[in-house]
C-alpha cells in the first residue's frame, strides 16, 4: 500500500524526515518497502515559453513551435489544438520518463526535428485533461524545473503490511501509528452531520436477509449532484497512491476508502427498482455483469446487494454495470457496510476478482466505522458535487459487535518480553494507539489491566496480542538480549537412539547405503 507524506500531514504534525520516519515505522512493525520522491520524473521537465508557432509543412494537424527555456531555444513538433504564442507550458526534455513508463527521445516527426515535448496534464500524471497542453500560470519563471515551480515535492511510502493489520490500510491508520511513535495527537476529519429530521426513511429502505454475511449496512442519500472532474488536489492524492481519477463522485468514494480504510460504493439511486436495497445471497446458477463488463457466475454462498427486483452489486467486491454512476446521474445512494471477512474472501477467490474493497473487507474493516465514512463521503459530495444532502441516515445493524475485554498481567508481560515497564507505562503505551484501559487491578505483586481494544483492531483477542503491542511501542531495539529462561539439565541417553545409531554405523561400514524415503508415501511406491 502507498501513502504520501503530504496526505499524512493533514492528520498529524510529523517531526521526522522521511528516512527516519520509514525506519521508525518499520521498527514499530509496519514494514516500509520503499521511499520514493513522487515527482522525481519531473526533474527533466521545465517551464517553457512558446515564442513562435508555425504550420508543419508535411502535416495539417501539427505545428512547429520554438520554445524558450531561459538559456536556450528548442524546436518542438506539437499536435495540441490550444498551443499559442506567448503561453507558458511544461516542456519535457529528451530522457524524460513519464508516469506510464515511456521514455522521451529526440525524434524526427514527419520530416521535422523535435527536441522535446509540450505536455498535457495526463501525460505528466498531474490530472486527467488530455484535450491540450497544460497551460501554466504566466507568473512562473521560464526555465525553472516544473516540480519546483509548482511546489510539487512529495514523498511516497510503500508498505508491505501483514494481513493482521487491516487498520493500517488507510492514511489515517498509518498516521495513528506515527502519532503513537511521536507521542503526539492525531487530527481526525470532521465526521459530523447535523440531521434535524429523518427524511431519508420516506425515500428508501434497507433490508438485510443475510445478517451472518452482512452484520451492518449504512447508507446516505445525496441528490442534485453534478458530475464533473474532481478538484486537482483530490485527483493528485488519488494518483499518489496509484488510483486513477474518474469523476468527482467516484473519486470521493475512493478518497474516503484510502483516508479511512472503509470501502464505499455509490449507486445511481434512480436505477434502483423500487428505490430500496435488499442484502441477500445469490442462487446457484445466477449470473451478474460487474462494472468491468464481465458476466460472473454466482452461487448460494455469495452475498449480493439487490434492489427491489435484481442484483446491483457483488457485496464487498464490485458494483454492477446496471447501477453505475453516469453523466446523467443526479441522485446517489452511498453504501458503507461491514461484511463478513470469510464470506468476502470466498467470493473474491471463487470469482477470481480482487479489488481494493475486497482486499480490506476480507481482512476485516472497522464495524463501528461505517457511519463515519458515509458521513465523510456525503459531506464531500455536497461540497464538491454541488449536491443536496437528504437528512437522516439508514443504519441496519442486526448483529452488533460484542465488547472484547482482555486481562493483561503486568508480571507475565515482564517475564515474556524481558522488559519491565510498570502498569502506568503499559497503560500509556496502549492508550497512545486508542486502546481503552478500563481498570487496573492490584493482585498482590501482580497487577492486571483490563483492556478494551478499539473496534478497528480486529486482530486483538488475547493477552499475548497486547504484549506484542507493548513490545513494538516500547521498541523492539530496547528489548535486551538474554538467554532463554529454561532449565539446562543433562538428560539420560535414550537406549533406543543409541542402538539405532550403532546399527547404522555397522551397516554403512559394511558397504550398505541408507535410503530415506519421502513422508506419506505408501510402502508399495
Predicted regions and their residues:
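Phosphate-backbone binding interfaces of nucleic-acid-interacting proteins
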Residues: 1-198, 333, 350-352, 356, ...
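Class II aminoacyl-tRNA synthetase-like tRNA-binding/catalytic domains
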Residues: 107, 277-318, 322-325, 486-525
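Short, hydrophobic beta-strand segments
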Residues: 3-7, 154-162, 215-223, 356-363, ...
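Extended, well-folded interaction surfaces typified by the phenylalanyl-tRNA synthetase beta subunit core
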Residues: 173, 406-525
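Glycine/proline-enriched, intrinsically flexible loops and inter-domain linkers
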Residues: 5, 23, 63, 182, ...
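Conserved catalytic alpha/beta cores of large enzymes that bind or transform nucleotide phosphates
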Residues: 122-123, 129, 227, 296, ...
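Terminal amphipathic helices with adjacent charged low-complexity linkers/tails
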Residues: 178-209, 385-413, 417-420, 466
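Conserved mixed alpha/beta core segments that line enzyme active sites in large multi-domain catalysts
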Residues: 33, 49-77, 235-236, 253-322
